Amino acid sequence: MPGMPAHPGALYTAEQVRDLDRRAIDEFGIPGYQLMTRAGHATLDALRALWPAAKSIAVLCGPGNNGGDGYVVARVARAQGLRTEVFCLDDPRQLSGDARQAHADFVAAGGHCRLWRGEPLDVDVIVDALFGTGLTREISGEAAELLRAANVAQRPIVAVDIPSGLHADSGAVLGVAARAALTVTFIGRKLGFYLGEGPEHVG
């Protein structure tokens, strides 16, 4: 979110955002996977607008719907001719719901994700789709190491909806958080973007 305004207007808690998301699905009949697809396209569009010379990206996909957004980004990026590396934390066959569909469509289009084993992220832009607004616990283990690797890679990071590891309501860092150059957020701006350590991480 480059150039965040001093007076951002309406801000939302994570629960309010989830409620609005449910309303879009239940009351307006928008399929959840359609919302996920829109999010993935919007993220890639914003990335390419800011870094039009980028030829390669790494997409870091987590175990939930944020990871599903990442698989959409990866599928569309491959279709547009970008060299696309996809790293996941867990076996994607354990995904469920819309995220499972996003991964299936990515694989059907010829994509492949692999578990991160400490290799450097040698690409033009990194896409952070590890954890979304539902995260409330501290990040540890391999997920923390992957985020640290992204932060020290000296590559711009594009966060999908929220930088992984940032508490959506308080702006607290939950162990470690992505330091994004750009956050492409959906439905509404989160309180945590403007509180605590949020401004240092959202871009």
Model-derived regions: residue spans:
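A broad detector of the eukaryotic-type serine/threonine protein kinase catalytic domain
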Residues: 22-25, 29, 111, 131-132, ...
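Conserved active-site and cofactor/substrate-binding residues in soluble primary-metabolism enzymes
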Residues: 12-15, 30-42, 68, 97, ...
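YjeF_N-associated NAD(P)HX repair module
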Residues: 2-19, 123-203
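Positively charged, low-complexity intrinsically disordered leader regions
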Residues: 1-56
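Nucleotide and nucleotide-moiety/phosphate-recognizing core
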Residues: 44-130, 138-160
